[in-house]
Amino acid sequence: MPRRGRTSLPWGLLGLLGVLLGGCMQTTLAPSSQANFTPRDRQQLAHPPYARASIPETYQRHIVDYQRRERPGTILVDTDARFLYYVLPQGKAIRYGVAVGEEAMAWSGVATVGRMSEWPDWIPTREIQERLGPYPSRVAGGAANPLGARALYLYEGGKDTLYRIHGTNQPEYIGQAISSGCIRMTNEDVIDLFDRVRPGATVVVLPPSRGGWAGGFRS
C-alpha cells in the first residue's frame, strides 16, 4: 500500500494548481476506438467476465483545454474530480474519467512512470486478503484481473511508490470513490493511455481536499 501522509510538493501549492483545472471549459468527446488493440486485447475484451457499463458522458474520454504548464507527455491525476489528464501540445489534454480507490488517497506529489505492463498479474497484499479475500497468492493477467489490461507503476527517487494507474474489471465505478485500489480506468482508456505514455514520463498527483471526501468511499 502507498505510504501514508507523503507528498512531494506543498499542499497549498498543489491545491492551488488544481484549481486551475476549472478553466478546462471547452471539451470535445473522443470516442473509444479498438484501432490500437493487440490480438490479445481483442480476445480478452470480446466477451469480458463483467457487465459492460454505461459510463456517464462526463467521465468518457474528452479532448479539453488545459491551462496548466506541464509539458506534453505529462500525466496529471485529480483525485477529487476523478479525472486523469494526459497533456498534449498547444494547450490541450486528453481527459479520462477514473475510479479512485482508498490507496490512491494515500500519496500525492510528483513521480515518474518507472515500469509499464500489459495484462499484468496481480499479487494481493495481506491487507487486501484480510479485508476482501480470500484470493490466490497471484492472479494471472486477464479480463477478470482487478488490474485490467494495463498498469503504470509510479516511482519516486528510483523507488516504487506502490501507486498504480491501471485498468479494471469493475467499469461501473468509473467516476466514483471506492474502498480499494489505486487509480482505475476502463480497459479501453488505459490501453489508449498506455500507448501514449513513455517510461520515465512525469506524473503529477494532486492531493485530495483537506476537508475529506463528501460521501466517503464505496465498497
Annotate each PLM feature.
Residues 1-13:
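Bacterial N-terminal signal peptides that target proteins for export
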Residues 18-44:
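Bacterial Sec signal peptide processing site at the extreme N-terminus
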Residues 50-163, 194, 211-213, 217-218:
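Gly/Pro-biased beta-strand-loop elements
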Residues 58-60, 173-181:
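Short, basic/aromatic beta-hairpin or loop at an interaction surface
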Residues 100-102, 168-171:
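Short, solvent-exposed aromatic-acidic interface loops
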Residues 147-148, 179, 199:
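A generic structural signal for well-ordered coil/turn residues at beta-strand boundaries
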Residues 183, 188-219:
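N-terminal targeting pre-sequences for secretion and organelle import
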